[in-house]
Amino acid sequence: MKSKKKKKKVTIKDIIRLIVLLVAFSVLLYPTFSSYLNEKNGSKVVSYYDEESVKLSKAEKEQMLEDARAYNKEMLGNIDFIDPFSQEDVEIDARYESLLNVDGSGMMGYIRIPKINVELPIYHGTSEAVLQAGVGHFWGTSLPVGGESTHTVLTGHRGLPTKTLFTNMDKLEVGDIFYIKVLDETLAYQIDQILTVLPQETDSLSIEPGKDYATLVTCTPFAINTHRLLVRGERIPYEEATKQEPDTNIKPELSFTAKVLIVTIIVIFIGLMIAIIYSIRDRKRRKVR
């Protein structure tokens, strides 16, 4: 008679190996999954902003926009630029913080960039707390309500381990579209200039008479941050913009790599559970013998 092949016993070492694999893949997945959760939370913040805006009367919204436009006119020729990422210690006046502050959270609107699939809240100022939460409006520049002779500047971080923010801003090209939503108004901007400058080089952030600009600012090169990447858009009619780049809601998505990691973790977890069950059975059999 042929001898039966002995079944390989599940050892403690096998279980430890599976646990190590499970932990390793979980660590690899954490930044991506955490970023995904933060983006979902950001979408909730944006939705809440829209809900709060709807509660305001037409007269209240018009007054808020009028106050913001009046502020922009007052700021003309009265701007002393410094690097947006050095504004941590700048004292911001209470009047500025009250403008476009729909629900008291400091959120004045949000930006949507279809090309890089981001939708981010815009807050007053560029303190580190603000830049960890979303995009900061560079205090001293025009509030993002559009109009002739305005230039709003919005800043965001790149390369945070748990948030995307402006990480992929270097993928934007001249001709791409981004949208800024404030109250009921959606402003469309088409990118017309991309510059890489030193932190102190802020001339390109100045207002040009008759122009309606919005510039996005982030640090570059990635993880080195010695320079600033400036992506400027010029206002174009909303209807014209949507023909080139539809203004649709952006939903956070997990990357293909993240999905593969999740499936791998599930498979390893199931394998670990099976290994533990077999190990327990083997021990019970040995005790019976």
Predicted regions and their residues:
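C-terminal single-pass membrane-anchor helix
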Residues: 247-289
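Solvent-exposed, non-transmembrane regions of membrane-associated and secreted proteins
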Residues: 8-256
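N-terminal Lys/Arg-rich, disordered targeting/topogenic segments
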Residues: 1-10, 284-289
